[in-house]
Amino acid sequence: MPPAGGIFHRPPTTRKSRRLTPRSACSNSTCSRTWGEQPWLLALHSIDSDRNAGRRPCKRRAIAMIRTIKSARGSVVNGGNGAMTSAVQTLLDQVEQGGDRAVRELSIRFDKFDRDSYRLTKAEIDACINSLTGREREDLDFAQDQIRNFAEAQRATLLDLEIETLPGVVLGHRNVPIQNVGCYVPGGKYPLLASAHMTVLTARVAGCERIITCAPPFQGKVAEKIVAAQALAGADEIYCLGGVQAIAAMAYGTETIAPVDMVAGPGNAYVAEAKRLLFGKVGIDLFAGPTETLVIADDSVDGELVATDLLGQAEHGVNSPAVLITNSEKLALDTVAEIGRLLTILPTAAIAAKAWEDFGEIILCETTKEMVAEADRLASEHVQVMTRDPDHFLNSMRNYGALFLGARTNVSFGDKVIGTNHTLPTNKAARYTGGLWVGKFLKTCTYQRILTDEASALIGEYGSRLSLMEGFVGHAEQSNIRVRRYGGRNVGYAMPVDPR
């Protein structure tokens, strides 16, 4: 992709933080300088944020041999707009009311795919597994081993609990697997078989009793590699269904598909909106929007590495934000140059370039404290840390989907093979939740028992008075009757129990 004429506009977000965001023109109305005629020249404009930028002359520095790109044109919008919500709700209603007939109609309409039954037979599944080359099967097995091993290690940390909190009072909890889980694996544009590992395998390790999976056809046929991954991960039922109709079929059930209790897995905006609308009818893993990547780097790495990692995630989609936070201006400018170079050779440049053009951002800070603060503010899905002391960010950051520490690892490793789950929070949801993991498929359910009459009377005494403080007479009487029966005390109906 040829470099676009333009400049980088740098309004400081704080006294020290400096943000480099692509701009096609300077926002300072008093500045008439244009740079489009010199595509290898980058102008860095510094404007006092405490004054009206339109009334202040620009300070300019020219740095040679740096490519420039266009401005960020907006922010990613997650969640459906009114039209999308209405359209998705209509499709959900069709499946709820029409069952298998509606599922078939929608599959033909959207995927041009028709079958008598969308559930694959054992023979079809075996054929998909057998279609793998030896190398492909070994690679799939290796990836699934890593994901299974880490999920099993996580599961081992989730212990049931039982404790005697007072003499004769026993409290506890059990981690109970969700019984029926539906896993969605996207595959319309790319056959994202890694999502089969991340959802099906994790649910299997959690101990879910029934795991069904849906994936759309790929290029008009059953997506063989996805089906193989689903089967090897341990799916009990595999359906060649995509989009809203797949999510609806799993949530509502049809004549031939028993409903599930939870739906997990990423998808496009319509799939995400369907999950949002169905939340409450079924559980979901999280609301997933466009892929986000944040690279935090200093001058211990070079621009080629940073640019490669930014574009490697930007190719997910034209609305995938890719951000660099650095304390090295040289690295920032080198990264811009490398992005320009790589976009001339990257096969997915059409997508990655659009994402970088519209949602790319570089934030230049002076201290690691500022870098941490900016990263926590962004609360990005993926945060890759390539600094001299990456553990500083591990110990300091609070808002992120997953951290990738050091230059030896990267987000792609997490997406495909290293073992951590790639289904992660987006749109700043990392402020309040982590990503998909084995614990998402478990319900931590509490229980209690009282072993002695004395303990029942003691708890009943407090329960009686506390209930009446809130005005709940029936609650109080539940306590009182036990104080009478197990404590031998004469307590009037709906009266508080006097302390001994």
From Swiss-Prot:
Zn(2+) binds at residues 313, 316, 415, 475. One of its GO terms (molecular function) is NAD binding. Keywords: Metal-binding, Oxidoreductase, Zinc. It comes from Mesorhizobium japonicum (strain LMG 29417 / CECT 9101 / MAFF 303099) (Mesorhizobium loti (strain MAFF 303099)). Its cofactor is Zn(2+). Its EC number is 1.1.-.-. It comes from the Bacteria. This is Histidinol dehydrogenase homolog 1. Belongs to the histidinol dehydrogenase family.
